[in-house]
Regions:
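Amphipathic alpha-helical assembly segments used for oligomerization, scaffolding, or translocation
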Residues: 1-74
Length: 74
């Protein structure tokens, strides 16, 4: 039972880590004066697609190693 709790906690931590990295990327995009609003939105949409795939990979992971692999694929 503790293994399951640890896995759930590891998944939550991994998703939080990924979310922080994504937010940093989005902030950089927003601060870039060389991009149009349309370009910024296109980049953010693509990043959010990748984020969703990453969350799915983390949610489907059955071990901490698989969680790390899912994070690394982002």
């Amino acid at each position: 039972l503790q293994d399951i709790k640890d896995l759930v906690k590891a998944k939550e931590n991994a998703k939080q880590d990924v979310d922080k990295q994504v937010q940093a990327l989005i902030d950089e995009i927003d601060r870039n004066p060389n991009l149009t609003d349309k370009e910024k939105q296109a980049l953010k949409d693509r990043i959010n697609q990748i984020l969703q795939q990453g969350h799915n990979g983390i949610n489907n992971a059955m071990t901490k190693e698989e969680i790390e692999q899912a994070k690394a694929q982002l």
